[in-house]
Amino acid sequence: MIHDVSERAYQLERSGQWVKGKSCDTFGPIGPWLVTTDEISDPQDLGLWLEVDGHRYQDGTTKTMVYGVAYLVAYLSQFFTLQPGDVISTGTPPGVGMGVKPDPVYLRPGQEVRLGVDGLGEQLQITVSDE
């Protein structure tokens, strides 16, 4: 699993591609381990969740992904050769803080972020300021 972290100020206030807001140092932690295809019976049937300070913001499954795993592998294979050990990030379930209405929620220093994928484990990060 990958924590799909976004620096929204980079994405919203600095125009251009959104990828720059996902490419900061320490963003995109992977783990607690990687699994191979023989270790997951159905990659389109995994629960996904994320909590901030104990409040669950995201709770979904891989069934609701815009693009399935097989499609993503086939599509990306058209542009470059995938090798054993390559990692493809598939995105995030519904419920991102920026989409909270009427007032978006953004991470602040010191907050505890926990996320997990059923059967694959959990991650825990404490947010810090870059200043």
Tell what function each PLM region has.
Residues 8-131:
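Catalytic-pocket segment enriched in acidic/His residues
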Residues 1:
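Extended Lys/Arg-rich, glycine-bearing segments that form polyanion-binding/interaction patches
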Residues 4:
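Active-site glycine-centered loops adjacent to acidic/histidine catalytic or metal-binding residues
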